[in-house]
Curated annotation (Swiss-Prot):
UniProtKB keywords: Amino-acid biosynthesis, Arginine biosynthesis, Cytoplasm, Lyase
UniProt-listed SUPFAM superfamilies: L-aspartase-like
PROSITE patterns according to UniProt: FUMARATE_LYASES (PS00163)
Subcellular location: Cytoplasm
Any one GO biological process: arginine biosynthetic process via ornithine
Name of the encoding gene: argH
Catalytic activity reported: 2-(N(omega)-L-arginino)succinate = fumarate + L-arginine
Major place of residence: cytoplasm
Protein name as it appears in the record: Argininosuccinate lyase
Pfam family, one: ASL_C2
Family named by the database record: Belongs to the lyase 1 family. Argininosuccinate lyase subfamily.
Length: 470
């Protein structure tokens, strides 16, 4: 390895073989190009393993001290950019072991006692993913806070509510934004739940059947912060459920980011015009000088595909594998690494977009909710309150809307006399019920968009998200 400090040599398992690997197969087989990402976790796991071996009398305390000192030296070399594994290291585990032997001599060869790369990589991957989950959960919360800040700024602002992308009923904009806070809360809870199944130690399962070496699995599990142990050694080295489950959880995060992103794209269009994008979160066209493009939500929408693809790839990878470890598992790492990276980047970008990248155009919103038939349901509710059966009221209002459309007028434009021709129970107070703010205020059921109910939601979320300190 030119320029490195790990040294070279044949593979650790090569004494069994008479010929070396074909160079192309060596390149095809190696994972060092990406699993070096697990270096810190590999060092942590190895130090815990060395200390446990000494506690169990397998090696001496002095040898454990030497091993841990060597591992810390490798950590320092990596921090300084001097630890440079090469292709002949195959993976991060061999790279560390070779460097350790180069540093310590025969003592370095004792580290792998009672351990296989199979349980070692499972341990590394779980430690790495646990750390990433612990970073992602606060990111989700940070984005929730950004949404909540926007909601608090628009507690009395109205926006058209849609079904089938057709205007349905006006809602409070804060209520609309809080719907995404709710989705993200489920995402956060899913990540916390996934963490429980990530945080189980496979270390000590060895290759597949356990080890005759007198080890203490509970000692290494405790030292590494695991909540428990795999009870079955075959399951311990074969399990990648946690990788699938995590990828599914992030896929749902991406779904929710993409749904909001799609709405922002729609809101920012000239056809809609509900939001104005800031220069800090939009780009222009190389040809059309008038353009301001919503790149952030478009990229989030597009990046869903790669996360969903990794989830499908993991499922496909493990679906036909016999017990126990198989080389197919090498394919889990790049998928997980990219799922984490993509999810984190998208959360960060959408947080910036919500905090700094858009502003709602209240004049356009006010005009939108006043210029449609989204108050039609309230006419039906008005009639129901006057003892008209709902289905009859529904039919009456449908006829009124049909007439208005043919005449090019809105419900508010009809005279009282005209209204009463449709049903005698209608009085002048109908016009108050048709006002957009009254339409929203009337939705007083728990969880509804009525202003008082929205204030309850805002208060509850401000407390839950500790917004004053966030």
């Amino acid at each position: 390895m030119a320029g490195g400090v790990t040294g070279g040599g044949s593979a650790t398992w090569s004494d069994r073989f008479e010929q070396g690997l074909h160079p192309a197969i060596e390149r095809f087989n190696a994972s060092i190009g990406f699993d070096i990402t697990l270096l810190q976790e590999d060092l942590d796991g190895s130090m815990a393993h060395a200390r446990m071996l000494a506690q169990c009398g397998v090696i001496s305390e002095a040898e454990a001290d030497q091993l841990c000192g060597g591992l810390e030296q490798i950590r320092a070399e990596a921090a300084e950019g001097r630890f440079q594994p090469g292709l002949d290291d195959e993976d991060v585990h061999f790279a560390v072991e070779r460097r350790l032997i180069a540093l310590l001599g025969p003592v370095g060869k004792k580290l792998h006692t009672g351990r296989s790369r199979n349980d070692q990589v499972g341990t590394d991957l779980r430690l790495w993913l646990r750390r990433r989950i612990d970073e992602l959960i606060p990111q989700v919360k940070t984005f929730q806070r950004a949404l909540l800040r926007q909601a608090l700024s628009h507690r009395r602002t109205l926006i058209p509510g849609y079904t089938h992308l057709q205007r349905a009923q006006p809602v409070c904009l804060a209520h609309h934004l809080l719907a995404y806070v709710e989705m993200l809360e489920r995402d956060r809870q899913r990540l916390e739940d996934v963490r429980k199944r990530v945080n189980v130690s496979p270390l000590g399962a060895a290759a597949l059947a356990g080890t005759p070496v007198p080890i203490d699995r509970r000692s290494t599990a405790a030292a590494l912060g695991f909540d428990g142990l795999y009870a079955n050694s075959l399951d311990a080295v074969s399990d990648r459920d946690f990788a699938v489950e995590f990828s599914a959880a992030i896929s749902l995060v991406m779904v929710h980011l993409s749904r909001l992103g799609e709405e922002v794209i729609f809101w920012a269009s000239e056809e809609c015009g509900f939001v104005r994008l800031s220069d800090r979160c939009a780009t222009g066209s190389s040809l059309m000088p008038q353009k301001k493009n919503p790149d952030v939500p478009e990229l989030v929408r597009g990046k869903c595909g790669r996360v969903f693809g990794h989830l499908q790839g993991l499922l496909t990878m493990i679906k036909g594998l016999p017990l126990a470890y198989n080389k197919d598992f090498q394919e889990d790492k790049e998928a997980l690494f990219d799922v984490v990276s993509t999810g984190s980047q998208c959360l960060e970008a959408m947080t910036i977009l919500m905090d700094e990248g858009l502003s709602f155009r209240e004049d356009r919103l006010e005009a939108a909710v006043a210029a449609d038939f989204s108050n039609a349901t309230d006419v039906a509710d008005y009639l129901v309150a006057r003892q008209v059966p709902f289905r009859e009221a529904y039919q009456i209002v449908g006829s009124v809307v049909k007439q208005c459309l043919s005449e090019g007028v809105l419900l508010r434009d009809l005279s009282l006399e005209r209204w009463q021709s449709f049903h005698p129970a209608i009085e002048s107070d109908l016009y108050d019920a048709l006002a957009p703010r009254q339409v929203v205020a009337a939705r007083t059921s728990e969880g509804g968009t009525g202003f008082d109910r929205v204030e309850e939601q805002l208060s509850a979320w401000s407390e839950r998200l500790d917004l004053a300190n966030g």
